[in-house]
């Protein structure tokens, strides 16, 4: 009995250390994402090479070292969000699309998180549509917008005051974007 408890204590200690490391990575990525978003709000998009160099250095200096294979849902989400904001800041719309796509696919591969974090899911869909619009990919945009409408009709996204407002805003803004594609 004593050996079993000792082994169990060791297992719990290892699990606690792993969880702690995941929390540190998630926190660093979350902070990086928020700092990039804040920079975008305060300064706008990169306008010249000097600003591009600053953002590149800032991003890569703040991006923590990680092993992607050890990531769970949360760490992947914050990684994709960080790369998305970095790409948007640099006006790299192709990479913005790439990371918005990864963000949305992460939710679609882990459907329970759509219910747990519907606002993040909706924001990911909106960024995916926005990036599709900017790269002028009409067929992709139409497909993603139709998929969004289908999810709304099938009530896949939980409804509350916040999600209803976001759905309304994102759906009709993107229907307007479709008109201009």
State each model region's role.
Residues 2-3, 31-48, 77-92, 122-135, ...:
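Tandem amphipathic alpha-helical repeat scaffolds
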Residues 76, 101-103, 120, 128, ...:
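N-terminal capping/interface segment
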Residues 23, 31, 43, 48-49, ...:
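Detector for Asparagine
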Residues 6, 49, 53, 70-74, ...:
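Alpha-solenoid helical-repeat scaffolds
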Residues 3-14, 44-63, 90-107, 135-155, ...:
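Helix-turn-helix repeat elements of alpha-solenoid scaffolds
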Residues 56-86:
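C-terminal intrinsically disordered extensions
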């Amino acid at each position: 009995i004593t050996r079993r408890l000792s082994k169990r204590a060791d297992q719990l200690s290892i699990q606690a250390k792993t969880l702690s490391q995941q929390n540190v990575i998630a926190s660093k990525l979350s902070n990086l994402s928020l700092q990039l978003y804040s920079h975008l709000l305060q300064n706008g998009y990169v306008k010249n090479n000097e600003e591009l160099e600053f953002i590149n250095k800032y991003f890569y200096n703040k991006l923590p070292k990680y092993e992607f294979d050890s990531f769970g849902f949360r760490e992947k989400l914050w990684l994709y969000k960080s790369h998305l904001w970095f790409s948007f800041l640099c006006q790299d719309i192709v990479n913005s699309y790439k990371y918005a796509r990864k963000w949305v696919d992460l939710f679609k591969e882990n459907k329970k998180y759509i219910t747990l974090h519907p606002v993040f899911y909706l924001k990911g869909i909106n960024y995916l549509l926005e990036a599709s619009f900017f790269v002028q990919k009409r067929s992709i945009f139409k497909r993603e917008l139709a998929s969004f409408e289908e999810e709304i009709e099938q009530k896949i996204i939980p409804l509350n005051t916040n999600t209803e407002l976001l759905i309304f805003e994102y759906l009709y803004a993107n229907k307007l974007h479709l008109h201009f594609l």
